[in-house]
Structure formats: structure tokens, C-alpha cells
């Protein structure tokens, strides 16, 4: 092995090799730990340049505490300790309809959930005592899962059938009277009958979102607000009642729950034995629908309880089966001020239903401004041939004089919107000649 001094003589004599320094890394082999000693870099020669640097570093002390920032909402007390945020000493809550809840709980309470939202029955109705009459409180209600299982109805009882679905976003129902004073809450029971349960994850109405076939437990929270504009609360108390546990369903599974709901719910009278929605009535309605509509006998048009006009949806049968009435004479038509039965004739309705939109079908006879001699070779006027709906016996289809028989007014005006009934001596047309 050659020494560097022998390989590079032009660089001059080098520094002699020395033993490893005490601070050298001992992990290297001894042959590689030998280094060169550089006397030009001794510390004694650099003291004039490094006089301000201390040999041993000192640990920095803790910074002084920062001054308190001014509050944006005025003077505010310091937040209470964490243990005080979850306690309201002396406050108690009792379930008003506890006996009803126990009756349902003995069978297994079920609550219907729908996409639109369904109210709970029984509803949570509580009474509170021990509140400060002058302080303000908020009443909240939420529903949380009891366990991590999914249930199914197995003949006579509920049993777990697998793992629960992922928990949905938690929602809280705020009582509409919140915030209110303690005297207001203690004056009467607090009812949460407006709470609605839904299974729609995209519900925009704020209803409580639940999974079907899961067991839930309602919780009631009482929150005291020391200052309405403050971000700190004076205390929170949560209450839960074991008898209010229920299973959410989209249709009742237990027949006994169905009977209990019908018997106890005042809004389910129609589903009782004597109600319109009882099983006997529902089966009868289904049979009637399968048989089809039954014909209803219609009474005479002059009766007092029957509406006058075939457009009434309460009438049955075909209007063409009725006997047509004879055409009135010109004297009777001129003296008549209103059509019989309060509406136009059935023949006019067959031509166009707009005749029954409230327009009169009998108009006074038109008197021409000046007499005209009849022309035997001239065809009958268009108006007489078109307006004649019911020619009398022995008369031809064409007449030389205008007819005064009943007609539908929409034929004259050319649209289904009737003109107002003309006054005495009035006319429907603005000209002085007959229409051709």
C-alpha cells in the first residue's frame, strides 16, 4: 500500500497520521478511524472570532403568559369547570304517561317510520321540577341506538338477526317553546308529540333519521343557558326512561301492538271494530270495487234534492235514456225567463258540454229592425237551420223565420265561454240584419 506522500510529492509534505481522537466514531474499523490532525484549526487560534458563543447551551425558560383577549360580547364570566357542564343539581324529570309506556313495553313497543315522517305514539310527555324560575332552559330530545344489532320478528318475539347498519347522522329535536324560563317549564307537563321519525337519509325537514328493524332509546336533555349570547352553558342534565325503548319498523309486526295502538290512540278511531276502517268495512269496500260501479237510479229533474244538470258527478245513468220533452211553443219560449231544472236541455249537452257552464239556453225572440218580405226561392237562413235543435211534428228541417226554440249560446258566439244574458230588448249580435 502506497502512502499519499509518495503518490503526490508535488503537494508537499503532509500532516503526520495520528491515533484516533477521543470523540471519533468507534463504529468504524481502527484502520479507518485514523484521521489527520490540523493544527491550523485549533480553538485557541479562533477565540477572537467566537468569543460571543457559549460553550454549553442553556435550556429556554417558559414564555410569560399572554394577556387575556377582550371579549367581543361584553363582560363574560370564565367558563365553568368541565364537571359542572354535565350536572344540574336538584333537577328531576318524571314520565307522565309511564303506565301507557309500560303497557306497550311489556309487549314490545314498535314505532312506524316513513319517508315523509311519522309521529311517535305513545309520545314522550314529562314533568320537571327543581328548576330556577328565573333562569332560561332548553328542552331537547334525541334518539340513540340501544345496541349494535339488527332485529327481526320471529313468530312470537323479536330476536337479533345480525350486525346493525352504520349509524346515521345524529339529529336533535328542540322543543318549540325553547328557550323558556324555569317557571314556564314547571307550570305544566312538557310534551314531545310533534317529534317525527323517518327513514329517509336525505330528509330536509329535520326529522329524526332511523334505521328500520333497530332498537332505539329516546333521551331528553335539559340545558341551562346562563346568557343567551354566551357560548358557555350553565349546565346540562340528560334523562332516559327504560320503558320508552322501541324498535323502528315500516309496518307493525306484532298484532298485539296493532291492537294496543288502535285502542289507545285517539286518532285511530276509524280502525276500531265499529269504525270505517275496520276489517269488515275494508273487505266490503274491496268487494264493491271488484264488482264494479253499481247503477244509481235518478229521480225526476224537478225534485228538490237532485241537482239539475247531467254534469253533476253525483248523478248516475245515461242522460240519453231519459224521455225528451216536447219543444215549447213560441209563446211559451218568449214568456219563459229561465230554463227548466236550472240548466239547458239534454240534447244541447250531447252536442257540447259547454252548454252547461251556466249560460241561459232560452233567449227572447229577436225582433227585426224593419220587416222583410219572405222570398220563396231563397234558402232558409243559416241561423234558423243551425239553431233548430228539436223541430216540432209536421215541420221541415228548414224554416223561413228564425226559431225561438232552446239552443246552446256557445253556437252563436263561436266559443265555449257564454256571453252575459241580454237584458230586455237586447240582442246577441250587433248587426241589424239576420245572420246567414
Swiss-Prot record:
The record's DNA-binding region positions are: 100-273
Listed GO CC annotations: chromatin; nucleus
Q: Where is the composition biased (Low complexity)?
A: 332-344
- One Pfam family per UniProt: T-box
UniProtKB keywords: Developmental protein, DNA-binding, Nucleus, Transcription, Transcription regulation
The entry lists its GO molecular-function terms as: DNA-binding transcription factor activity, RNA polymerase II-specific; RNA polymerase II cis-regulatory region sequence-specific DNA binding; RNA polymerase II-specific DNA-binding transcription factor binding; sequence-specific double-stranded DNA binding
Instruction: State the SUPFAM superfamilies in the record.
Output: p53-like transcription factors
Q: Is Transmembrane helix there in the keyword field?
A: no
Keyword Protein biosynthesis appears in the UniProt entry: no
| Intracellular or extracellular location(s) | Nucleus
Gene3D superfamilies named among the record's database cross-references: Transcription factor, T-box
UniProt function note: T-box transcription factor that plays an essential role in the determination of the fate of axial stem cells: neural vs mesodermal. Acts in part by down-regulating, a specific enhancer (N1) of SOX2, to inhibit neural development. Seems to also play an essential role in left/right axis determination and acts through effects on Notch signaling around the node as well as through an effect on the morphology and motility of the nodal cilia.
Annotated protein name in UniProt: T-box transcription factor TBX6
Organism, per UniProt?
Rattus norvegicus (Rat)
Top-level taxonomy: Eukaryota, Metazoa, Chordata, Craniata, Vertebrata
